[in-house]
């Protein structure tokens, strides 16, 4: 358990921050929204990076607590672990489907339950969506998601390499799907049957609430198609898509300190209607 959690954090750390740098360079070469690529929003980038770094230190601290707990270690070692010893490909598919369904359901809940939305709105307040948006989350949202996923994955008991493989896929798709990267129309149409593409997910970040409450998939859009929550936009209209939310669009609202306090100041800030 200890080794598994440590490996997961290390892989996500390297992939996330290394991937962000590479995709930021790619965004400047083949941008989906050219007006975004023509600016250098240093302040916004710094705020998004700062929140991502803070959350990673929080995860590291939680991993330390979990791996040093004898109770947790005993629970893991005596648990059912139905995936242990399964063929790796079968175990990967099970982990993929179970976790992606849970994340899909949690994501819908974060949009539909008012107090959860106050946390998740931190992610959606970014008015310029690019790869740095991918890990812009309130820390309490991160803790709630981990509180659901860690026990489920632990009970499934997949081999470490299976879980690491899933996290590599997950982190990679999350980074690419948030990036301001232009994919050819035909490629996007094919890929979005398998994975969440930048265009598919950008629509989820639209200021228009009809689109905000759609396209919940994180790695795959399958559950959006299955439960009727997928929406689409003509390929040529993405350049004109207004992202962020219809309120709290002032650049000051995206400062790290304000983002962390947002859920607790929600009603007062919303009353400004900006």
Spans of model-derived segments:
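Short, strongly hydrophobic alpha-helical membrane anchors
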Residues: 1-9
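Hydrophobic core of alpha-helical transmembrane segments in multi-pass integral membrane proteins
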Residues: 15-25, 59-60, 67
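Membrane-interface helix-loop junction between the first two transmembrane segments
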Residues: 25-46
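A transmembrane-helix-recognition feature enriched in membrane-embedded lipid enzymes
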Residues: 45, 218-226, 256-267
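A membrane-cytosol interface segment of integral membrane proteins
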Residues: 238-274
């Amino acid at each position: 358990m200890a080794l598994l959690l440590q490996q997961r954090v290390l892989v996500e750390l390297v992939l996330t921050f290394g991937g962000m740098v590479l995709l930021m360079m790619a965004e400047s070469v083949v941008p989906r929204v050219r007006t975004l690529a023509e600016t250098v929003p240093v302040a916004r980038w710094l705020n998004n990076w700062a929140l991502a770094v803070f959350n990673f230190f929080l995860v590291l601290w939680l991993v330390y607590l979990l791996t040093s707990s004898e109770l947790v270690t005993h629970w893991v070692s005596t648990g059912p672990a139905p995936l242990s010893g399964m063929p790796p490909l079968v175990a990967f598919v099970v982990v993929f489907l179970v976790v992606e369904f849970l994340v899909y359901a949690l994501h819908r809940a974060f949009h539909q339950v008012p107090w959860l939305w106050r946390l998740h709105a931190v992610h959606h307040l970014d008015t310029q969506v690019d790869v740095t948006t991918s890990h812009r989350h309130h820390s309490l949202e991160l803790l709630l998601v981990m509180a659901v996923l860690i026990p489920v994955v632990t009970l499934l008991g997949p081999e470490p390499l299976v879980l690491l493989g899933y996290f590599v896929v997950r982190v990679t798709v999350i980074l690419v799907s948030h990036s301001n990267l232009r994919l050819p129309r035909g490629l996007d149409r094919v890929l979005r049957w398998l994975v969440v593409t930048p265009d598919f997910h950008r629509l989820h970040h639209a200021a228009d609430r009809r689109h905000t409450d759609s396209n919940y998939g994180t790695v795959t859009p399958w559950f959006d198609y299955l439960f009727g929550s997928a929406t689409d936009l003509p390929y040529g209209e993405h350049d004109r898509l207004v992202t962020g939310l219809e309120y709290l669009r002032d650049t000051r609202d995206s400062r790290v300190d304000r983002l962390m306090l947002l859920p607790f100041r929600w009603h007062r800030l919303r009353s400004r209607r900006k």
